[in-house]
């Protein structure tokens, strides 16, 4: 399943986040796959698409960052799947 993970960087934490990433990498467990991400120009948020079959894997991954990042996790589907799902209701 796909998830939009919105990372809310804690105040002043952006340098710490990037330093930790350089030293330790993403720290996602096997089965939690990173697809892509975008960071706001003010370094306050990151919008990240992750793919995994077990939501608990995301919790495990987020626990590695929860001291400097607050997370919002939203299950998502592709536009193609959304179009197919809504078609019978049109």
Task: Describe the predicted segments one by one.
Residues 62:
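Short, flexible helix/strand-to-coil boundary loops that buttress conserved ligand/catalytic motifs
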Residues 49:
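Small, basic N-terminal interaction modules of short regulatory proteins
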Residues 68-79:
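Conserved short beta-strand edge segments in small beta-sheet-based binding/regulatory domains
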Residues 1-35, 39-45, 53-57, 77-90:
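Short S/T/G/P-rich N-terminal loop/turn motif that feeds into the first structured element of a domain
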